[in-house]
């Protein structure tokens, strides 16, 4: 008798449970529809000002949701009604992933192009390979892609510097970057007369190069003497 009663109760509660789930799904869809335009406005505004990897854009949009979107009672109240935050986080994650997927298809977000452009810019400023790698990793670019982009950039750059195909492309590019860094910071052979009068200036300049990510041999060579005229193109 107890089994029959239990089954009857379960059968009677099923339509109500379905209605509850249906209403919850409808509300979630409505909230997501309201959220996506706000995410899209933020994403397009950001991409219009800065290049970005997919992972970095995802972080930007997550921060935007936490800092700005949640000020709206509509979204704050919906999150508060959830038994836990997992449902809300899943809704936000789905909306962001949908947006980034669309932008990737349109070419607005491309990790390979982003890595190449960042490497070109940072090398021009005298950044070491280690510094560039750490920077791109912090932006969510995968290590294999970073290595591939660096190798391509090194080969392209060194082709304009040396004619010997046996020359190590990475060493050539790293030395050129180290010299740029030293020149910008007035280190080593680029130091001013005032800078050379400071105590222990040579050791301090070398330490600065090492902290910037350059290897010892490259740093010593970059600090020792300026390149011959026009040797770097």
Language model segments and positions:
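An alpha-helical, amphipathic repeat domain used for nucleic-acid recognition
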Residues: 1-233
